[in-house]
Amino acid sequence: MAVTTLVGCGNKGAKADGGSSDAAITVMSREDGSGTRGAFIELFGIEEEENGEKVDKTTDEASITNSTSVMMSSVANDANAIGYISLGSLNDTVKAVKIDGAEASVDNVKNGSYKVVRPFNIVLGKKASDAANDFVNYIMSADGQKIIEDNGYIPVDEGAAAYQASNAKGKVVVGGSSSVSPVMEKLVEAYSEANTNIQVDVQTTDSTTGVSSTVEGSYDIGMASRDLKDDETAQGVEGKTIAKDGIAVIVNNESSVDELSTDQVKSIFTGETTSWSDITK
């Protein structure tokens, strides 16, 4: 199985400019355990059912990146690359392609024309501390939801009330998804000013670790950029949606490709389509 794992600041062997319409497509995917990968393969039909089980059909030729930032830098340094990231993390180092004619934007997620959308969830145990519950109340308040919107994500409660601090004190450890982490850090920054009695630390891993570590008790609050699975909630945790986020399909800025269909994305990531000429001709 020809899998390359990229964990540094990009693919050093790739060419950063030029690109060719007949070049081989460099497929870049996230690692197993990534909530973004889980949502991506589901939304594009890359996950198929075989013998009663769901199977990830991502091509074995895909290079595997272990975080949002590595995915972006890897695509930015390979003119023939294609990958996917949180819409809220998109910047001008890469180009998001239209999907089925719809641009990847917050407005299009809101109006329903851009359909590649997933939830941002926090994960809570049944015995969450008072401090953890206070931070959750902040996230779901008008104050927290405004921070979510201001950072390019879609709030889930536009009619929320203003935050009111409790008497709780202590430390809260939040960990999990590298897609949720950027907006969580913004929330923590603002929360630290709204309530000086509670310290919140953020640890960036992946969605699956966010769930399992909350189950184990090493995280007070987990982060998952996907819905929780039945076997996860059966372990005594629950997911709470704090925001919605699009998944942007990204290519190098030098790429001539500006738009793909859902079927074309599936064909590329399952390895059926391997050359850009099959897309651009």
Where are these regions (language model features)?
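C-terminal motif of bacterial Sec signal peptides marking the signal peptidase cleavage site
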Residues: T4-G8
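Exported/periplasmic ABC-transporter solute-binding proteins
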Residues: C9-K281
